[in-house]
């Protein structure tokens, strides 16, 4: 149990003020309405006092009660109960089983003498159902056995509206709307007097203890339960709050949210409704009354009246926060919302939320702290300032005053516990990352992002790079020094780049690759630099580092030129300048020329020739000293052959001279082909290389896109070379037969038969002859079909002509042009297929056909 000072007990009326020495009456009941305090005594007097509250300089409250009037009610018994009906200016007084109406100020009975007889106890309905503002609803326990009566009380009259029977004799009652909460002889029940429905709550023994039934809010009651428990119950018969444990012999109870105040023979105890713990105990002997009136709790003995004054709200809240009782402080603050002006409450509550947030933060309850910080709209710099050196040196931030917490910095908060420090830093990283893109960060994004960068760098966190490659507001001087301190040189380069200092960034990265400084963030940093330069829009930066990237790797380094976006290649980088730069780097030069020729397809003879020469030089370097025609073709040689075949821009004669005597027969054959020297090319392929498939491919390659006679001439040349004199005649004969049989359609069969030796059998040339015959028959039949179609078309035209000649056209001076509606002045006209006649000049100016074939008539 934790001790809390929630209330102070302040005297309001001493016996000397209440009764004179000769008076023998004792205080029996109390009522308070605003400043009006009423006391009923055992000798049937009612006293009226005016209460005045004063606050002393120290903050404590005092009360002064000024006695106004007192009146004897004319009975011999004690005044049992008093209830004020301020709307009617009436005081309801229960004495000797009768409820009388007296004026609140004069204490005079109403002239009509209206009263309610036969009552043992009564309660006012603070949630009335009648809807009449000029009356109050009163529920009484009748002297009739097991009977409850409901009355409407007006200024000068009373009216009974309902009488309800109960299962047992009622001892105490509280009312809310249509619902009665009753203490019966053996149990508590909820009774709806409108419908008669009853709900049992729990058993109660009236012989052992005094019943307590208090309405504490809308449709909720506080009851004295078994086992010394203060029980809460709703009109639905359920409890939405846990019970509080108080004394077994409680005399009275009241609620002053969030506290339950109870009175027994010796003490006043205060329990929290939030955690059900006892918070305060006040010694108070001989007390027999404890009631709350509009939030004011009054206790009384038979000789005096005292007021339980709650400590000032903010002091209570601050005391709770100082005791780290966050939930109680927040609930207490919320409960005061109705009593404080809205703007003042919002300022106060926001500050309480933030204080609570820092308490939870200090206890490492980060989720709760984060929610409180959000609700309180924390200036996140308050949190950052706890972490030494995280705020930028240029920050103008000063902590809130009065302070929101008691800590100088994180080291004091954690008492040097490095594990706690690490947890706090992880929380701040997470929190800053969440709020940096929200409205919370507006106005001090630089402080947030700079702090976040420092945390990431210190923790070697992967998100450091993500922060720097996206939009951020990291301050360069602070951030650069921090990154350098923690040897985050790659990240420092990203920071330079974000601040448009690309030269500094690249120079830093180059130093890492060269080993001048150590940073293992990226194992592929060289490739990253190449990629960075590739997309850089600063030509000077690229040229400045071109030699460095090429020296480390020609194949990778040349990408700063070859992978550059096309628009930048055309604007800031002249190919001739790049070629001049790459002369020292032959591999890179080849890659760049390949890029120009094959990817960009630049139609410039110089580039094509240069690339071919470089290919040729490399092929010659790779060739063995003794050429072997069966040697495997290298990748470079394949590229050379492909370039020689596909390009028409290189200098053929120049390359022919370079290949002459170089032992490159296939390349020479391709060059001869480019010069239309087909016999020489085929001679090389057939006689020197004996590469018959290559010879056939040559014919197909050179005849691609040309007319059929050209293609036929090439194949006839190849056949002639096969059949001509020379070495390897048998092999050439087989090749000739294969050529004819595979490409029969490419030959003129009549010419071929004249060239073939007479010793060749028909069976040998069967595929060729069949193909030739099929082609001849196909050609003849195709011609016949074409002739037939032409004749049919001609016949159709003749038929149309005869139809036109078969009908006559009569032209007279009464005929009108269907375009201009004027007569024809000469026998010259245009006739449309629909029969319409128009002037020739009208037809020339208008290309539309007349809508009607009928001749116009003069009117």
Curated annotation (Swiss-Prot):
Keyword set, alphabetical order: Cytoplasm, Endosome, Protein transport, Transport
Compartments (UniProt record): Cytoplasm; Early endosome
PROSITE patterns, A to Z: CHCR, CNH
CC annotations in GO: cytoplasm; early endosome; membrane
Repeat found in the keyword field: no
A GO biological-process term: autophagy
CHCR repeats: 563-727
A Pfam entry, by short name: Vps39_1
Domain CNH residue range list: 24-297
InterPro entries reported for this sequence: Clathrin_H-chain/VPS_repeat, CNH_dom, Vam6/VPS39/TRAP1, VPS39/TGF_beta_rcpt-assoc_1, VPS39/TGFA1_Znf
Function per UniProt: Plays a role in the TGF-beta/activin signaling pathway. It associates with inactive heteromeric TGF-beta and activin receptor complexes, mainly through the type II receptor, and is released upon activation of signaling. May recruit SMAD4 to the vicinity of the receptor complex and facilitate its interaction with receptor-regulated Smads, such as SMAD2.
Family per similarity comment: Belongs to the TRAP1 family.
Subunit and interaction comment: Interacts with TGFBR2 and ACVR2B; in the absence of ligand stimulation. Interacts with TGFBR1, ACVRL1, BMPR1A and ACVR1B; in the absence of ligand stimulation and to a less extent. Interacts with SMAD4; the interaction seems to be mutually exclusive with the interaction of SMAD4 and phosphorylated SMAD2. May interact with ALOX5. Interacts with RAB5C. Interacts with VPS8, VPS11 and VPS16. Component of the putative class C core vacuole/endosome tethering (CORVET) complex; the core of which composed of the class C Vps proteins VPS11, VPS16, VPS18 and VPS33A, is associated with VPS8 and TGFBRAP1.
Protein name, UniProt field: Transforming growth factor-beta receptor-associated protein 1
Lineage: Eukaryota, Metazoa, Chordata, Craniata, Vertebrata
Name of the coding gene: TGFBRAP1
